[in-house]
Amino acid sequence: MISKQEYQAQAAQGYNRIPLVQELLADLDTPLSLYLKLANRPYTYLLESVVGGERFGRYSFIGLPCSHYLKASGKHVDVYQNGEIVEQHDGNPLPFIEAFHNRFKTPEIPSLPRFTGGLVGYFGYETIYNFEHFAHRLKNTTKADPLGTPDILLMLSQELAVIDNLSGKIHLVVYADPSQPDGYERARERLEDIRTQLRQSCAIPLSLGSKHTEAVSEFGEEPFKACVNKIKDYIFAGDCMQVVPSQRMSMEFTDSPLALYRALRTLNPSPYLFYYDFGDFHIVGSSPEILVRRERNDVIVRPIAGTRLRGKTPAEDLANEQDLLSDAKEIAEHVMLIDLGRNDVGRISKTGEVKVTDKMVIEKYSHVMHIVSNVEGRLKDGMTNMDILAATFPAGTLSGAPKVRAMEIIEEVEPSKRGIYGGAVGVWGFNNDMDLAIAIRTAVVKNNTLYVQSGAGVVADSDPASEWQETQNKARAVIHAAQMVQEGLDK
């Protein structure tokens, strides 16, 4: 931990949030047990990662209760402090959010990973209406909104635990405010309070089961197939090459959302595992796909397109993999999305600094396998995170190509707002690094109802029945996890 003198020196350099860090051994705990001890209440989060579908990433992140958060819906933003609105803004929320983030000047913590606090949460799909370069082409008609969640919700994370899964150590991070005369002392006291919480045992909430329920499609199979045929008509007319319609399913779910996270992380380990408690609703997900990642001046997108079910035996698994890589339709769709990713990254990158690294590799998850590629670029000077978001949002894999025309068609054919689905979840650090996953393989739990949404890439030779089945396959991991909870994880 830095000394009072070091703290004062950093304050003199103009930093208005200064991290105090304490390192402890926590090798007898897991990220889940630590979350139960330190957080497990509204406006907290747990973020984990599984690399290559096989091993947990080095770091996990637990956000302690956030006193400040922003909610944006339409052209209005509310800033909350301890549950009370303390600031409001009318107009495009994105410049306001960027300015809010930029209020905080913090030194880096060299010994820790790139994320050690900042804005954490989501940008829902309807954020599209705030990007001026294509919003004027979208009608933004009033649609049904079964979930009723904000378009954007971001927490200001100033107290967190960074878990090093390799060493078994936990790094407690509390930001001190040097504008307060006793800011340093208050942060030290807060660290001691958190240490006390760690020493206490926590009650493990057992999942003993509940009544079994079935997921019901909002769209319905036949209307969805008709939607696929309508999109094919647009494709044959030359309007577009691909569109990704989606359908939402819902089911009664009265169990703990944290139990759902336990089941999902076991059933479908993914590069982005996340649990957000927003008070009146929860987001639980295991997304395989980056929307965009910024690390200093490098930017990465990672398109995923092309799907097969996992085989029941190694031989069947290999056969499915070979079948996927030899499927001309799937390869053509994936190449189109690589080109879209190159175009998106190229808008914000220096000339000649965009490259495809991993190209058409297979990644395997619990229920499905995908074709994946990596597109990287070196940012132009002066690019902001909102410039990056504007260039990459929404993902081509969730919209289609050309992107804007595909979004117009989605707006026409889908019956309700997408909400969180198809948007982005993740972190925007104080250091301006950003790591956002696409909100897929993601459940929203609200009012004892679980919602999950999934899409299918429709091209000229798509079969409506196959595209309907693809949406079922993609939602299967979340629905199976919910049914595991209903059967009882701890019986």
Swiss-Prot record:
The UniProt annotation places Mg(2+) binding at 333, 470
List of residues binding L-tryptophan: 49, 271-273
Q: Which Pfam families match?
A: Anth_synt_I_N, Chorismate_bind
- What enzyme class is recorded for this protein? lyase
Q: Which cofactor does it need?
A: Mg(2+)
Q: Does the keyword Manganese apply?
A: no
GO molecular-function term, one example from the UniProt record: metal ion binding
Gene expressing this chain: trpE
What catalytic activity does the UniProt entry give for this protein?
A: chorismate + L-glutamine = anthranilate + pyruvate + L-glutamate + H(+)
Q: Tell me the domain of life.
A: Bacteria
In what pathway does it function?
Answer: Amino-acid biosynthesis; L-tryptophan biosynthesis; L-tryptophan from chorismate: step 1/5
Q: What is this protein called?
A: Anthranilate synthase component 1
